[in-house]
Amino acid sequence: MQPTPKSESELLLRAQDLAGSTLGELAEQAGIITPPDLKRDKGWIGQLLEWHLGAMAGSKPIPDFPELGIELKTIPIGYSGKPLETTFVCVAPLIGLHGLHWGNSHIRHKLARVLWVPVEGERDIPLADRHVGSPLLWSPSIEEEQQLRQDWEELMDMIVLGRVEHITARHGEVLQLRPKAANSRALTEAYGANGQPIKTLPRGFYLKTHFTAAILARHFIL
């Protein structure tokens, strides 16, 4: 793995150096085998870029570059230049919610400063041949943070009221909550409608594609 970058500008410079390379080239440099597809290795692209950029956090609940307070997010892009799928941010807390508010939430911490790295994502392009795009460093604008906060508060209210199983991907304007589990047996605790403990699938917060598309469009003037 590459050494951890010491500044935001060093990190951005490194990410810019990767732009134009294929995933196959980057994997070869890192001595990592490129899988045939991402069916069993959903996080493979992120891990490959973490290696090249010197990210330290891995799956810990802190930003990928803790010293810089920056989170790394890869974003698969289609031929249209638009994101192909929603972006996972973090696992949602379903119990122990007393005293939790937007200001001290894990999701706000994760989205405070993000290094977005677009990657070709169309399935007809072999994984090894997909190119990495130009990176951008982003922090939410006042308006974006307001949108995120509003959705988060609405979703967390439903969780607190024991309505987690009633939440669908349609709830939220820019943020959605949906099950995140490799298999349906991986259950976790939550509150039921009468405050009783229930078992349910873990949930994750995801950014909707129109939100991430707007970030890219503003930066790259698509």
Curated annotation (Swiss-Prot):
Q: Where in the cell is it found?
A: Cytoplasm
Upper classification of the source organism reads:
Bacteria, Pseudomonadati, Pseudomonadota, Gammaproteobacteria, Vibrionales
Q: What is this protein called?
A: DNA mismatch repair protein MutH
Could you cite one Gene Ontology molecular function of this protein?
endonuclease activity
- GO-annotated cellular components: cytoplasm
Q: Which NCBIfam families match?
A: mutH_TIGR (TIGR02248), PRK05070.1 (NF003458)
Its chief place of residence is cytoplasm
Gene3D superfamilies for this protein:
DNA mismatch repair MutH/Restriction endonuclease, type II (3.40.600.10)
Q: Which UniProt keywords apply?
A: Cytoplasm, DNA damage, DNA repair, Endonuclease, Hydrolase, Nuclease
Does the record bear Transport in its keywords? no
- Family membership, please give it: Belongs to the MutH family.
Q: Where does the source fall among the domains of life?
A: Bacteria
- Which InterPro entries does this entry report, sorted A to Z? DNA_mismatch_repair_MutH, DNA_rep_MutH/RE_typeII_Sau3AI, DNA_rep_MutH/T2_RE_sf, Restrct_endonuc-II-like
Biological process according to GO:
DNA modification; mismatch repair
Q: Which organism is it from?
A: Photobacterium profundum (strain SS9)
Q: What does this protein's UniProt record list under function?
A: Sequence-specific endonuclease that cleaves unmethylated GATC sequences. It is involved in DNA mismatch repair.
